[in-house]
C-alpha cells in the first residue's frame, strides 16, 4: 500500500481512521474506521455522492460506529493502537487500486474507495441496497470525464457549481429582485454576446449604478424567453473569484481550479455564459513567481470565442488594471453604464416596492419612494443612484420593522410604572404604621388603574399586531402566486397560468384590499395607531439626516420656534451688529424652508470691520445656535496660508507629494460634516491666489479635491472675516453708529484694491461691522459677567456687580479701535484677579454671594454679602 499514490482526501481519511482505532482501543485499522472517516471528512466527496443518491448518511455513519464497537478492545501497557491494517481494510484498498486502473487514474481517490466499499463491506451494501447503478451514474457525472492526475482532484469536480452560482436558476426559484429599465444596456450586451468572436461584453460604470443588475436582467429575460433564439438555451453563471482563490494551499492549485471551471464552460459548447463581477481582480490573481495569472489564462479562450464572458468593473479600476493589459482589453467590448436620473430611479423603486414590502412586512407610500430618489440625489453626493436611493428605502423599512417588533413607547412607560408600583407595594406590605397603610391603600388604587390601562393598551397592541400579521401573510401569498404565474407562463403551462391569473391572484388582491380597508377603518389614521407599519417620506428624511447631518426632515415645533427667533438668539451673543445678524439668520431660514438656490451654498458673507467688534463671534454663535455646539464650525485661520503653495493644504497635496492620502483640511472637514458653518478668519492675511479656489465654492457650491472627488458645499454657510477698511470705518463713523454712504464707498475701494472682482461678485453680501459704542460696551460687560458667573457656579459661588460698577468698567475699557477685547482684559484685571486672590486667601464656603460696588475714589470694592445655609 503506497500512501503517495493516494489523494490528499484519502490520506486524511486514513489518518482519521488511525485516530478512531485509538479511541476504540483497537490494534487493527478496521474497514469501518476508514469508511466512517471518509464519511466525516470536510467537503467529503464520499458523503456528497451518497446524499445525492438519497441514502441516509447519518444512519450509515451510526452503523459504522456500531460495527466498530463490536470489535474486541485491547487494554494494557505499551500497546500501540491502530498500527496494523486489518485484512478486510487491506482488501478495500486493493480493490480501490484496481478501480483506479479501470478509470485510468494516477491516484486512489474517494470515488474508488466508495466503489470498493460497495463491493466488499456488508454494512455499505445493506444501506446502498439496489442503488448501485444510480451511484455509478452520479460518480460519472461528478467526474465529468476528468481523470485523477493530481492529489487534489476534487477541485476539478463540478467546479462551476462549487465556485459559481447559476443566476438563471435563481431567477426560476424567485430569489432575485426584478430589474426595472436598463433596456438599452441589456440589448447592447445581447448584441455583443451574439457575435462569433470577441463576444465578451464588459460593463463599465460607477459603483452602485446597476452593472450587476444588467446581468440579472439578462438572466430574467432568458427565463422569460425574451431573448434572441441564439441565447434561449443559455445559462448565466456568476464566478466567485474569492472562493476560487480561498484555500488554494499548494502551488498551481488556483490554476487547476480555474482550468477546471474553464473546461466546464468550454465543454458546454457555448451554453454557459460566465459572469465575472469585479473583473479587474483577474489581472494578477494567482500570480506567484513564474506562475501565470488568471487574466492570461483567459485570453486564448476569449479570443477564439470559446468562452462567453461578461465582466463588470468600475471606471477607475478598468483604467488601472484592464487598460494596462491591452491584449486583455481588446478581447472585451465595452458597455457604458451611466447613472440613472431621478425619474428613472423612482421607476426602479416602484418596481422593487412590493419585494421590500413583503420582506419587511411594512407598507411603503409612493411619496416615500419619490423622497428617497430626490433627497439621495440632492444630499448624498459621494454615492450613485439607484443604489443610494434603494439603501434609503431599505433602511427606512428596517427602522419601521424594528419598531413594530418592540413595544410602543406608551405601553412601555405603563409597564415600567406598573413594575415600579409593584415593587413599592411589596415594600409597604411589611410596614405596620398607619401612614404606610394609608400610602399602601392609595398605591393599590393607583396600581389597579395602571393595570387596567396596561391591559387595555396591551389588548390594542396585540389586536394591531394580529391585523398587521394577517396583512403580511396575504402580501406574501400574493407574491408567491405572482412568482408561480411567471413560472407557469415560462413553462407554457397555460391551464395553471390561467387559473392563477384569472382566479387566485384577483381573489388574493381583493382579500388584501378588504383587510387594508378594515384595518384603516378600525384603527383610524396612521397617527392614531399604536404600531406604525407605514414608511413615509418623513422616515426617509430622518435617515438622510442621520447619514449626512443635514436637517431635511419636516420641521418639528421646537425647531420652528428656534428658527423664527434665530436673530434674537444671535443678538444675545453679538452686540450692536443688527444688519449682520439679520442677513445671516435670513439665509438660514431660507435654506431650512427649502427655497434657497439648491446649487449654491446656504449663504456666503464677507464681514468687514475693526478688530473685536463680533465678526468671529457671530460665526461661533451661529454654529452654536444651529448645532448646539461651536465644534460644528470649520475654522480655517487664513494667516496660515500666506504662501502661494499653501492652497494645497485646503484641497490636499497633489499626487506624488507627501500627504496626498490625507486629503485637504477644508475638503475633508466638509466631506465629514456637509452641514456646517465655515469660518475663513482674517482672509486678507492669505496669499491672493488662495482665493481662486473659492470661486467654484461660492458660485456652484462644489470643490474638487486633489483626488478628483467632488466635495459638496451646498449645505454650508461660508463666512469670511477681514480688517480691510477698518481704519476708514473708525475715522468716519457717525456718533449714532451709522455708516455713511461715503464711508461705505471708501471701504469698498480698499476692498477692490485687494480682492479680484470675480470673488466679490460671487458673495451673497459684504457686511460692514460698525465700531462699538459706549452703550454696546455696557451690554458686553453684562455678557462677560454672566460667563464669569457660569464658571463660578461650579464652586457654588456667585458674584453681583452694581450698575455703577458696570458703567465704570465699560467707560474705562472703551477703545473704539480695539473693540471688546480690551474690556475682557480689563474685567480680568479689575474683577477676576482680586476675586481669585480672595478665594485662595479666605476660601469661601458654598452658597457665598460676592457683591462688587464702585466707591467714591472710582475703585471697586468686594463684599461677602450673604451665605446660604
Curated annotation (Swiss-Prot):
Tell me the organism's taxonomic lineage: Bacteria, Bacillati, Bacillota, Bacilli, Bacillales
Which UniProt keywords are present, listed alphabetically? ATP-binding, Chaperone, Coiled coil, Cytoplasm, Nucleotide-binding, Repeat, Stress response
**Cited Gene3D superfamilies:** 1.10.8.60, Clp, N-terminal domain, P-loop containing nucleotide triphosphate hydrolases
What organism is listed for this UniProt entry?
A: Staphylococcus aureus (strain COL)
Q: Which family does it belong to?
A: Belongs to the ClpA/ClpB family.
Segments carrying the region annotation (C-terminal) are: 772-869
| Domain remark text | The Clp repeat (R) domain probably functions as a substrate-discriminating domain, recruiting aggregated proteins to the ClpB hexamer and/or stabilizing bound proteins. The NBD2 domain is responsible for oligomerization, whereas the NBD1 domain stabilizes the hexamer probably in an ATP-dependent manner. The movement of the coiled-coil domain is essential for ClpB ability to rescue proteins from an aggregated state, probably by pulling apart large aggregated proteins, which are bound between the coiled-coils motifs of adjacent ClpB subunits in the functional hexamer.
Describe the protein's quaternary organization and the partners it interacts with.
Homohexamer. The oligomerization is ATP-dependent.
- On whether Nucleotidyltransferase is a keyword of this UniProt record, the answer is no
Name the major location: cytoplasm
Q: Which residues of the sequence carry a binding annotation for ATP 1?
A: 205-212
Q: NCBIfam families annotated for this entry?
A: chaperone_ClpB
Task: Please list the GO biological process terms of this entry.
Answer: cellular response to heat; protein refolding
Q: Where is this region: NBD1?
A: 158-339
Q: Know the name of this protein?
A: Chaperone protein ClpB
Region annotated Linker sits at: 340-549
Question: What is the purpose of this protein?
Answer: Part of a stress-induced multi-chaperone system, it is involved in the recovery of the cell from heat-induced damage, in cooperation with DnaK, DnaJ and GrpE. Acts before DnaK, in the processing of protein aggregates. Protein binding stimulates the ATPase activity; ATP hydrolysis unfolds the denatured protein aggregates, which probably helps expose new hydrophobic binding sites on the surface of ClpB-bound aggregates, contributing to the solubilization and refolding of denatured protein aggregates by DnaK.
Q: Where is this region: Repeat 1?
A: 6-71
Record PANTHER family: ATP-DEPENDENT CLP PROTEASE, HEAT SHOCK PROTEIN 104
> Could you tell me where this protein is found in the cell?
Cytoplasm
Q: Which residues form a coiled coil?
A: 390-524
What superkingdom heads the lineage? Bacteria
Q: Which InterPro entries match?
A: AAA+_ATPase (IPR003593), ATPase_AAA_core (IPR003959), Chaperonin_ClpB (IPR017730), Clp_ATPase_C (IPR019489), Clp_N_dom_sf (IPR036628), Clp_R_dom (IPR004176), ClpA/B (IPR001270), ClpA/B_CS1 (IPR018368)
Domain called Clp R: residue spans = 3-145
This entry carries the following GO cellular component terms, namely: cytoplasm
Amino acid at each position: 500500500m503506497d500512501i503517495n499514490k493516494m489523494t490528499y482526501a484519502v490520506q486524511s481519511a486514513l489518518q482519521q481512521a488511525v485516530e478512531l482505532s485509538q479511541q476504540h482501543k483497537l490494534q487493527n485499522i478496521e474497514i469501518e474506521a476508514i469508511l466512517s472517516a471518509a464519511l466525516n471528512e470536510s467537503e467529503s466527496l464520499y458523503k456528497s455522492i451518497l446524499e445525492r443518491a438519497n441514502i441516509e448518511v447519518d444512519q450509515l455513519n451510526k452503523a459504522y460506529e456500531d460495527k466498530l464497537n463490536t470489535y474486541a478492545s485491547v487494554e494494557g501497557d505499551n500497546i500501540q493502537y491502530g498500527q496494523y491494517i486489518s485484512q478486510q481494510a487491506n482488501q478495500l484498498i486493493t480493490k480501490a487500486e484496481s478501480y483506479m486502473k479501470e478509470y485510468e487514474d494516477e491516484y486512489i481517490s474517494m470515488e474508488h474507495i466508495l466503489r470498493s466499499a460497495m463491493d466488499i463491506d456488508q454494512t455499505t451494501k445493506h444501506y446502498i441496497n439496489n442503488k448501485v447503478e444510480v451511484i455509478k451514474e452520479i460518480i460519472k457525472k461528478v467526474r465529468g470525464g476528468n481523470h485523477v492526475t493530481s492529489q487534489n482532484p476534487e477541485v476539478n469536480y463540478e467546479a462551476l457549481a462549487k465556485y459559481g452560482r447559476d443566476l438563471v436558476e435563481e431567477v426560476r426559484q424567485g430569489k432575485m429582485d426584478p430589474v426595472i429599465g436598463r433596456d438599452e444596456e441589456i440589448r447592447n450586451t445581447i448584441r455583443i454576446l451574439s457575435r462569433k468572436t470577441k463576444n465578451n461584453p464588459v460593463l463599465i460604470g460607477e459603483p452602485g449604478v446597476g452593472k450587476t443588475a444588467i446581468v440579472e436582467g439578462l438572466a430574467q429575460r432568458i427565463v422569460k424567453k425574451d431573448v434572441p433564439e441564439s441565447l434561449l438555451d443559455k445559462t448565466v453563471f456568476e464566478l466567485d473569484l474569492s472562493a476560487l482563490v480561498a484555500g488554494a494551499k499548494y502551488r498551481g492549485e488556483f490554476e487547476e481550479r480555474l482550468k477546471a471551471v474553464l473546461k466546464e464552460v468550454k465543454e458546454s459548447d457555448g451554453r454557459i455564459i460566465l459572469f465575472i463581477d469585479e473583473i479587474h481582480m483577474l489581472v494578477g490573481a494567482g500570480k506567484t513567481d513564474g506562475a501565470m495569472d488568471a487574466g492570461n489564462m483567459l485570453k486564448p479562450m476569449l479570443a477564439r470565442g470559446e468562452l462567453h464572458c461578461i465582466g463588470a468593473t468600475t471606471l477607475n479600476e478598468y483604467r488601472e488594471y484592464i487598460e494596462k493589459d491591452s491584449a486583455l482589453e481588446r478581447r472585451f467590448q465595452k458597455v457604458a453604464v451611466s447613472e440613472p436620473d431621478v425619474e428613472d430611479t423612482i421607476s426602479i423603486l416602484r418596481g422593487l416596492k412590493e419585494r421590500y414590502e413583503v420582506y419587511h412586512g411594512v407598507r411603503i407610500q409612493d411619496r416615500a419612494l419619490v423622497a428617497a430618489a430626490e433627497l439621495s440625489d440632492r444630499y448624498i453626493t459621494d454615492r450613485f443612484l439607484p443604489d443610494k436611493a434603494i439603501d434609503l428605502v431599505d433602511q427606512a423599512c428596517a427602522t419601521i420593522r424594528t419598531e413594530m417588533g418592540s413595544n410602543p413607547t406608551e405601553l412601555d412607560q405603563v409597564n415600567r410604572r406598573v413594575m415600579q408600583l409593584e415593587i413599592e407595594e411589596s415594600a409597604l406590605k411589611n410596614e405596620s404604621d398607619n401612614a404606610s397603610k394609608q400610602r399602601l391603600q392609595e398605591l393599590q388604587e393607583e396600581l389597579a388603574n395602571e393595570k387596567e390601562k396596561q391591559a387595555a393598551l396591551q389588548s390594542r397592541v396585540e389586536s394591531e399586531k394580529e391585523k398587521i400579521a394577517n396583512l403580511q401573510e396575504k402580501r406574501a401569498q400574493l407574491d408567491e402566486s405572482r412568482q408561480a404565474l411567471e413560472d407557469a407562463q415560462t413553462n407554457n403551462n397555460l391551464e395553471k397560468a390561467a387559473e392563477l391569473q384569472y382566479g387566485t391572484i384577483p381573489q388574493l388582491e381583493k382579500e388584501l384590499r378588504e383587510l387594508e380597508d378594515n384595518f384603516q377603518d378600525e384603527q383610524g389614521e396612521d397617527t392614531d395607531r399604536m404600531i406604525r407599519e407605514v414608511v413615509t417620506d418623513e422616515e426617509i428624511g430622518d435617515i438622510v439626516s442621520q447619514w449626512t447631518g443635514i436637517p431635511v426632515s419636516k420641521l418639528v415645533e421646537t425647531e420652528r420656534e428656534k428658527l423664527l427667533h434665530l436673530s434674537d438668539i444671535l443678538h444675545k451673543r453679538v452686540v450692536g451688529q443688527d444688519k449682520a445678524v439679520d442677513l445671516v439668520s435670513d439665509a438660514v431660514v431660507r435654506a431650512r424652508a427649502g427655497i434657497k438656490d439648491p446649487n449654491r451654498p446656504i449663504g456666503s458673507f464677507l464681514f468687514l470691520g475693526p478688530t473685536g467688534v463680533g465678526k468671529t463671534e457671530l460665526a461661533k454663535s451661529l454654529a452654536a445656535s444651529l448645532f448646539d455646539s461651536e465644534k460644528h464650525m470649520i475654522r480655517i485661520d487664513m494667516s496660515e496660508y500666506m504662501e502661494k503653495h499653501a492652497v494645497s493644504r485646503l484641497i490636499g497635496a497633489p499626487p506624488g507629494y507627501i500627504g496626498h492620502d490625507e486629503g485637504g483640511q477644508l475638503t475633508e472637514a466638509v466631506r465629514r460634516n456637509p452641514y456646517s458653518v465655515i469660518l475663513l478668519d482674517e482672509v486678507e492675511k492669505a496669499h491672493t491666489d488662495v482665493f481662486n479656489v473659492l470661486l467654484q465654492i461660492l458660485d456652484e457650491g462644489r470643490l474638487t479635491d486633489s483626488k478628483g472627488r467632488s466635495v459638496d458645499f451646498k449645505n454650508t454657510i461660508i463666512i469670511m472675516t477681514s480688517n480691510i477698511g477698518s481704519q476708514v470705518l473708525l475715522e468716519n463713523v457717525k456718533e449714532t453708529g451709522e455708516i455713511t454712504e461715503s464711508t461705505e464707498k471708501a471701504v469698498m475701494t480698499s476692498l477692490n484694491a485687494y480682492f479680484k472682482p470675480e470673488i466679490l461678485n460671487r458673495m451673497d453680501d459684504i457686511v460692514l461691522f460698525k465700531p462699538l459704542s459706549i452703550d454696546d460696551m455696557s451690554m458686553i460687560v453684562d455678557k462677560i459677567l454672566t460667563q464669569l458667573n457660569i464658571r463660578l457656579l461650579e464652586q457654588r459661588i456667585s458674584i453681583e456687580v452694581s450698575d455703577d460698577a458696570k458703567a465704570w468698567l465699560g467707560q474705562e475699557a472703551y477703545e473704539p479701535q480695539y473693540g471688546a477685547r480690551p474690556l475682557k482684559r480689563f474685567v480680568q484685571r479689575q474683577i477676576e484677579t482680586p476675586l481669585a486672590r480672595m478665594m485662595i486667601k479666605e476660601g469661601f464656603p458654598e452658597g457665598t454671594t460676592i457683591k462688587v460696588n464702585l466707591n467714591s475714589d472710582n475703585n471697586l470694592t468686594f463684599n461677602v454679602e450673604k451665605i446660604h445655609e
